[in-house]
Amino acid sequence: MAFRTNTSKAQEGGNSLKPEGDYEVIIDTAEVTRTQSGKDKINIVYVIRNDVQQAYQNGLIFDSIWKKKEPNEDDQSIGGYNFGQLMAIANAAKLPDGKEYAGLDDFLAELKGKPLRVHLYHDDYNDKWYEKIDRHEPTTLTAVKHKAKGKSAPAQTAAPATAPAQNAAPVSDPYPF
């Protein structure tokens, strides 16, 4: 099939840093995971909304919330994670103030699918640049018309396991590089 070049649509590889700034996003996943080195963290994946005129629509932004070295009482109520950071996300996602959750997993499940606005900046760590989020705000838009990017299920090549693995490998760092 023939095609023409169109350099106005040129873009760098998928692992390049997104520009610093504000992005309207939807929380795709929010879950407790473990790094390869055995540290627990809350991993939050944001999808850049495709119903808003902005660059990198359907792109992903990764955020991690780590356990505090010296957790206070509020932090301890959620397993030692930074309570203030999670409440900033809850406030931006417009979760009801004062609602009681049975546990951290229930709270994280309620975040899924919520729209908000994040501010992304670049952080230098060990001579590599990473995308980080330093601010969460409520979305500035009233209606959400984001369409999730279709995911095709992978073809099953083997019979499903009959029992869960006892020594499953921990989830690796969410950074794609």
Model-identified regions with their sequence ranges:
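Short beta-rich binding modules
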Residues: 1-177
